[in-house]
Each structure stands twice: as C-alpha cells, then as structure tokens.
C-alpha cells in the first residue's frame, strides 16, 4: 500500500512538473512531449477521462506536431477500451483522415474493424473503408469472414434473435460464402432453441446437400427428431438410417437404431421392423427397456 501511495504521489509530482513546463514554455520543443507524457501518466493511473482530456489539449495546441498522431491514436484507443464505440469510431476516423498512410492510421483501421465486428455492423465498415484515404483495401473475402464472425459473436452473447437475423443476412449476402455450412448449422441450433421445426428442416436439409460436412451427424439428429415429432415417420426412418451410417459413437448408433425400429413399426413395414429389431438386439450396451421394446416389436 505504501509503495502504491508513493507511486501515486510520484505521478502527481510528475504531472505538476509537466504542467509547469507547458505553462512556462509553451513554444518549447519539449512542451508537446510534456503534454503527451502527462496524458500517458493518466493512462498508467487508469484515469482514461483525464488522459483523453490531456491528449485533446495537445491536439488543439499542437495540431501539426508528429506527437499529435500518437495522441490522436491514444484517444481512439481509450474510448475503445472504455466501450465508447461511437466516440472511438469518430476518433479513429480523424486519425485516418488526418494522417493517411501512417502507422497510426493503419492501427486505427484495425481497431475500427474490431469495433464494427463487435457491433455487428460490417456493412458500415465496408462503406467506411471504401471512403477512407490511404489506399485501404477491404475485399469481398474479408467482408465474408467478418460478417460471419460478427454473427457468431452475437450468438455467443446469447442474443439469439439478432444472431438469427445476422446468419440469415450472411447467407443472403454470400450465397457461396466460405462459412455457409457454419451459418446453416447455427440456424439449426437456433431453430431447436426456438422449437421452430420448419427452420430445423430447412437448414438441416441445406447441410445434408453436402453429406460429408462436419455438421451432418448433428444435423441428422435434429432432423430425424423433428420428422418423428411431426409424424413424418417415413422421412424420419430415412434420416435415422443416414444417422446410423454416420454415427461416430455407440450412443449415436443406438439412437439411430431405436429411431429406425419405431419408425418402421409405425409405418407398418414389417421387413424394416425385423431388421431394425435384430440390429438393436445385437448392441452390447442395450438397456433392458430397449431390449424389451425390440422383442415386443
């Protein structure tokens, strides 16, 4: 505690010296650096509002100084860290417009990209990038990936309805996009959460157009369950058969065989029922309840 108190007093004394230097020698080549260091001392004390005020003071007094680039970039970064995205955007835009081609402008553009991804406003970033000076490139493949990443982040934050809209927008904007299968899979999950059977059938169907994709097994589980619940037993039987072929675990295979047995029985397909019951009874981990069910059929 004493060490922290000593450090705090040292920072206060340092700022007093810097203020005295700037006040007494405003035309000194060291004055602009003193103002910058004053701002940095506030940053180190986690006093972002005072730091921003100091950096803005520097920019107003020494707008053409090379140190101004660093101060302008600091302002954007501090707003960004505080979650003041709209103010950060404006600050970073000033950096890019005033110092095109600089390292600060390049870093500002990277932070702007992150901000727009966090806000799920990639179209706005694309328009901004096109309008900014400095030969900034933002090609279609990057817009594709960022649009998907933004939607995925929204889903991860539990904003399901917004994520649903964002994934649908991604699929409409990039019908051949690199993350199309991922988007369809997330829409299946959202459909399951919202008990939207039509949505699950639509997007699981899209996934199964590419049967060897990494989501096909999960898609078949959801699709078969929906078809069974909707009493589309013949369709469910076909889905459970596909699931059995793709099952990567014994539990999934057991689920598929149980589904096949029940569907075959309900559509009165005796041959399929016998085959399904025989396969189910051969399973090593069969529960007594399922064993009795297979024998009954």
Model-inferred region functions:
Residues 22-31, 59-69, 96-107, 134-143, ...:
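Short solvent-exposed coil/turn linkers within tandem alpha-helical repeat scaffolds
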Residues 2-13:
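Single conserved hydrophobic/aromatic residue that forms the stacking wall/gate
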């Amino acid at each position: 505690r004493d060490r922290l108190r000593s450090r705090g007093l040292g920072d206060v004394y340092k700022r007093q010296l810097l203020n005295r230097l700037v006040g007494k020698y405003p035309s000194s080549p060291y004055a602009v650096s003193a103002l910058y260091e004053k701002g940095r001392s506030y940053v180190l004390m986690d006093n972002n509002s005072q730091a921003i005020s100091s950096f803005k003071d520097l920019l107003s007094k020494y707008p053409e100084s090379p140190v101004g680039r660093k101060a302008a970039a600091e302002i954007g970064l501090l707003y960004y860290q505080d979650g003041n995205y709209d103010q950060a955007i404006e600050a970073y835009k000033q950096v890019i417009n005033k110092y095109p081609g600089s390292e600060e402008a390049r870093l500002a553009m990277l932070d702007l990209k992150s901000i727009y991804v966090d806000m799920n406003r990639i179209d706005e970033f694309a328009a901004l990038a096109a309008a900014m000076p400095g030969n900034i490139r933002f090609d279609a493949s990057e817009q594709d990936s960022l649009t998907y990443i933004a939607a995925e982040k929204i889903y991860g934050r539990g904003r399901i309805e917004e994520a649903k809209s964002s994934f649908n927008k991604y699929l409409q904007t990039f019908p051949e996009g690199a993350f199309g299968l991922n988007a369809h899979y997330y829409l299946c999950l959202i459909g399951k959460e919202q008990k939207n059977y039509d949505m699950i059938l639509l997007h699981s169907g899209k996934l199964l157009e590419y049967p060897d994709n990494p989501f096909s097994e999960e898609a078949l589980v959801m699709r078969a369950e929906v078809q069974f619940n909707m009493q589309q037993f013949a369709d469910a039987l076909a889905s459970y058969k596909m699931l059995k072929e793709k099952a990567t675990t014994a539990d999934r295979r057991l689920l598929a065989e149980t589904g096949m047995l029940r569907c075959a029985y309900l559509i009165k397909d005796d041959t399929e029922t016998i085959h399904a019951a025989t396969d189910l009874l051969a399973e090593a981990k069969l529960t007594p309840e399922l064993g009795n069910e297979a024998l009954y059929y």
